[in-house]
Structures are given as C-alpha cells and as structure tokens.
C-alpha cells in the first residue's frame, strides 16, 4: 500500500525529505532521519493503533524496564545534534528512549525502552516540533511572576540571582550571602522550574566568596555596580577553580578600574561566562565585544538588543536609566548611558551570533531584558540573518544547520556553561524530560505543551467551562504538574558540590543536584557556537572587524513571530 507524502504527513507527521516552516519565519527544517517504522507507526485515538493487543502490550507491566510512563509519538525533534522523527519515551521523569515505540508482541523493530503498556500515557506528537526546555542563565529574581512567564514561553530552567524588587536585585543578578541564598532556595521550591542561584562575586578576597558557594550558590556573579575590579575578578575565579563552579561577569563600563585588556589579564586564561557581551547591557566601553573571540570566554547575549531593529537604540536609553538608578537630569548619568548604547556593536552582534561566535542567549529579566522572549528573539534573529545573509553553509534547501546552531544557544550551551548539562539542555536519553512541543505555525512564539520532568506543567488551554478543551479564549495556563507536591518531584535546585556535601542546605522538599565540569571547559565546548576569531573595535567609530573584515547589518522595521501572534 502506498500513500502520498501529504496524506502520510497528515496521519503521522512529516518524514525524511519533508520540510517544515518554523512559524512565519523564512526558516525551514528538513527531516534527516525517521526512527519510526513505515507501516508500524503508533498513533492514539478511535480506530487507531495504540489499543490493547495491537500497539499496546496486553501483558507488560510498569516493573518492566522497557515500559515507559509516557510516550510522545511521531515527534519531529529539533536539537543541536540533529532534526529527526521519532517516538520519545519517558520513565521516572527522565528521557528513557528515543526510537520506535509499540508492542513487541505484534510489531517488529520496537526500540528497547519503548514498549507501550497499560501504564503508559500518550502525548500525540504528530505534526509537532519537539525541543528541549530552555535554559535562561541571566535572571534577576525581581518578581516571582517572571517564572510563570518564562515557563509559558518554553523555558524550564532559570539561573541568576536576587531577592525581590530591591535596589541590588533590580540592577545585579546576585543573591548575596548564606541567609538570602537559603531563603530564596526555600521560596523557589514552590515554583515548577529548575533553579540555580548566583552569589555575589564582588570581593577582592576569597573568604566572603567561598562561604557563598558552601551555602549552595551554584556560581558567582561579578557586576560593575558592586565594583568589578581586576582584584575581584581574580578572587572570584580563584574560588571558582577551587569549588568547580562558574563565574558570570558584567565588566566595568566606565573603565574606572581598568580597560578590557586588564579584565582579560585578570581572567588569566580561566573560563568565564560574559553576560551581554556586546556591551549595551554593560561592560567595558566600547570594546568588551572583543572577548567573544577568546578560547576561555563563554559569551552570551541578553535579548533586548537581539535582533537589531529600528527601535532598539531608542528604547535602550530609558531602559538603562531605570535599571541602574540613573537620572536624566544628571549629565554624567546621561553620558554613562550613552556610552553603552552603540549601533555599530549592536549591528555586529546579530552577525556574530550567525557566525557561531556568540554562544548563548538569555533574558536579563526585568533588568534590561524580557523574560518571556528568549526563545522568540533567538528565532527572530535566525530569520533576520537568513534574510540578510542568505543560507548558512552547509545548508541548502533547508536551514537545519542554522536551526541547530540557534536552538543550542538557549538549551545545551547555557547548560554546559553552568555545569548542568548532565541533567538538562537537550533531548537525550538520561536527562530530565523537560520538553516543549510546538505547532509549527506557532514555533518560537507560543508552545502547545510544556513538560517538566515528564508531566504537563503548562499548555495552551481553552475555556475550562467548555465541553471540549479548545474553545476560546485559548492562552497558556498552568496544568496539574504545577501544583501541590508535583514540582518537588519533577524539578531540581542546582547547587555547588560543596553545598551539597556540607549538609547545611535547607530542606525544601525537592532534590538538589550539584553542578560539575565548569572549569575544564572552554569555547570549544559550546556546541555549534565555538568560533574564536580575532575581534577588534575602532575606538572612534565603534566599527567591529572580525579577522580584519567589517561586520555589520541593517536594522529591520518588521519581524516574524510578532504582531501576528501577540496583542501586547
């Protein structure tokens, strides 16, 4: 029996050779492999395959290691490692198998770990794109409402610092000291995401920093508003080396304690995560962007400058004034703000992402960044670069390489940078089943279904009083996995190994997981985003050159994944 490609796609989703458009962008992905078996596909529904004795085993029980708790059928997986069609199994909250699901008693080729039984739930992935949950590593914990906004956008892990709408938190991503760290670990345990806290890294001696790591901080944050001097940089990195944690840095915009060359010397070849590496969010003016080419620097962007549009420059001045407690009535404050907002370096940032020089995307939530737009702006930037720069080699009739490069920026690479990639960051066996399902038409804008630890934690849901789930108004709403004790069973708090072993962490009900392998990594470990070119900035014109060639792009006045999808 033969069916047309269109009929097959309608039944089971796209297969090898089919292309899928992502949202209303110009990006197309093509199915590279199909791990399901033609003629033996599993699908749930009336008159379909997953029924007792057909696609569902009559005898297998949950005690069988091959029986998953959940199967996502016929999903199109988009991850840094490829674009494939497969069934995905989840057991005990973790991805247990990727391949072909079904009943080995009646079907050939069922992948070990994907035997569907009476204890197996089904999520219909036909026609949907499956990605890993996003990892946002630049969170100012100003308001708990951020967490719901981030979750409903497809982010499942938040790393940063803060204690609420205080002056320190509104400007800097630090949770200072043991008391604040423990109270925030207790507070965040009530929310259905994974969390990690950055301690305050600004001290020129090591003891005040080390005690925060032992208290459970998963890393340290250096911020210029607290004084990012070469001595503080050296002390923070020295503690990080001792405890195997990451250091994130916002360098000295005013160049008061040194220039970018002094910061590089203080790094001394040690691994460091540079926030908003373009500089509008802060950092040595005008040339902090140079560090993106260093092998020990893990560079990220924050999303308000991404991608470069006709409104980017105008909104940044007011944004900066509010976030850093500046006054438009004080000339020195105005000059400080203007020194950080440079069209030339912002224009270069888009291209450096496309070249794989900038490795990560993040939000800078409510502190010059939008917590619910990390994923959207990543794909807007990818679209803009395809339109302005053309296909990205080796792409041809589809944009698989570009899509894999960009999805890595908010999934696997931030997870690697902060030592949590053994738990989250990709669609791979053994990792937490933090997964996001997208209708292709809404890809990058509005997830259909968000799974946290293998359970649906949020979804597009219609009127609760309707006779079916789909009547308007349809918008993202928390689901059962967001309530009661479920978040404790499906979510993690990431802490230092020293904090975990010290025995002094508060009993918050959820599992702690220690970060690891943050010091033996470098730019080479940033998946598909590991380029280390020579970057130079003209100190008078601010033009950016990469290996001697001018790098720039034009701002755009229209983007996809925007007004068509959102009223506000």
From Swiss-Prot:
Ni(2+) 2 binds at residues 221, 250, 276. One of its GO terms (molecular function) is urease activity. Belongs to the metallo-dependent hydrolases superfamily. Urease alpha subunit family. Pathway: Nitrogen metabolism; urea degradation; CO(2) and NH(3) from urea (urease route): step 1/1. Residues 133-568 form the Urease domain. One of its GO terms (biological process) is urea catabolic process. Keywords: Cytoplasm, Hydrolase, Metal-binding, Nickel. Its EC number is 3.5.1.5. Carboxylation allows a single lysine to coordinate two nickel ions. Ni(2+) 1 binds at residues 138, 140, 221, 364. Heterohexamer of 3 UreC (alpha) and 3 UreAB (gamma/beta) subunits. Binds 2 nickel ions per subunit. It catalyses: urea + 2 H2O + H(+) = hydrogencarbonate + 2 NH4(+). It is found in: Cytoplasm. This is Urease subunit alpha. Its main location: cytoplasm. The active site is at residue 324. Substrate binds at residue 223. Its cofactor is Ni cation. InterPro entries: Amidohydro-rel, Metal-dep_hydrolase_composite, Metal_Hydrolase, Urease_alpha_N_dom, Urease_alpha_subunit, Urease_AS, Urease_asu, Urease_asu_c. The modification N6-carboxylysine is found at residue 221. GO terms for cellular component: cytoplasm.
């Amino acid at each position: 029996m033969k069916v047309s490609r269109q009929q097959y796609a309608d039944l089971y989703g796209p297969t090898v050779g089919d292309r899928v458009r992502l949202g209303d962008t110009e990006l197309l992905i093509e199915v590279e492999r199909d791990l399901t078996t033609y003629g033996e596909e599993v699908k749930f529904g009336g008159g379909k395959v997953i029924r007792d004795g057909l696609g569902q085993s009559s005898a297998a029980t949950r005690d069988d290691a091959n029986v998953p708790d959940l199967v996502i059928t016929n999903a199109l997986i988009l991850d840094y490692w490829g674009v494939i069609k497969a069934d995905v199994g989840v057991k005990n909250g973790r991805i247990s198998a990727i391949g072909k699901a079904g009943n080995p008693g009646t079907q050939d080729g069922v992948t070990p770990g994907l035997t569907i039984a009476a204890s197996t739930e089904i999520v219909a992935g036909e026609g949907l794109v499956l990605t890993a949950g996003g990892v946002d590593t630049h969170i100012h914990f100003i308001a708990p409402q951020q967490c719901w906004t981030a979750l409903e956008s497809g982010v499942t892990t938040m790393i940063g610092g803060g204690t609420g709408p205080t002056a320190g938190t509104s400007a800097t991503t630090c949770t200072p000291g043991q008391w604040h760290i423990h109270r925030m670990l207790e507070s965040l345990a009530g929310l259905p995401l994974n969390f990690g806290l950055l301690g305050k890294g600004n001290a020129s001696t090591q003891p005040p920093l080390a005690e925060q790591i032992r208290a459970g901080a998963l890393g340290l944050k250096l911020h210029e508003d607290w004084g990012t001097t070469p001595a503080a940089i050296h002390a923070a990195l020295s503690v990080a080396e001792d405890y195997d944690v990451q250091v994130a840095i916002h360098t000295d915009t005013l160049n008061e304690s040194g220039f970018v060359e002094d910061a590089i010397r203080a790094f001394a070849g040690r691994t460091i995560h540079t926030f908003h590496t373009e500089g509008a969010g802060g950092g040595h003016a005008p040339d902090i962007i140079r560090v993106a080419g260093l092998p020990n620097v893990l560079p990220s962007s924050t999303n308000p400058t991404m991608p470069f549009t006709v409104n980017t420059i105008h909104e940044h001045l007011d944004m900066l004034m509010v976030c850093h407690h500046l006054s438009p009535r004080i000339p020195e404050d105005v000059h400080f703000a203007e020194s950080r907002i440079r069209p030339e370096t912002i224009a270069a940032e888009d291209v450096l992402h496309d070249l794989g020089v900038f490795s990560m995307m993040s939000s800078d939530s409510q502190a010059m960044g939008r917590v619910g737009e990390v994923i959207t702006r990543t794909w807007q930037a990818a679209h803009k670069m395809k339109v302005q720069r053309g296909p990205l080699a080796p792409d041809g009739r589809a944009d698989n390489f570009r899509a894999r490069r960009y999805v890595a920026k908010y999934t696997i690479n931030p997870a690697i940078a902060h030592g949590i990639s053994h738990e989250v960051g990709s669609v791979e066996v053994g990792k937490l089943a933090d997964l996001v399902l997208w209708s292709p038409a809404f890809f990058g804008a509005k997830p259909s279904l968000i799974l946290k630890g293998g359970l649906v934690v949020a979804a597009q849901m219609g009127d609760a009083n309707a006779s079916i789930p789909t009547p308007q108004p349809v918008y993202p709403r928390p689901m059962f996995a967001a309530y009661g004790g479920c978040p404790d069973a499906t979510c993690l708090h990431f802490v230092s190994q020293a904090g975990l072993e010290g025995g002094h962490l508060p009993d918050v009900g959820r599992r702690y997981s220690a970060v690891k392998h943050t010091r033996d990594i470098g730019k080479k470990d940033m998946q598909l985003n590991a380029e280390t070119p020579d970057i130079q900035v003209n100190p008078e014109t601010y033009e950016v050159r990469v290996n001697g060639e001018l790098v720039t792009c034009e701002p755009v006045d229209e983007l996809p994944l925007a007004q068509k999808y959102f009223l506000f």
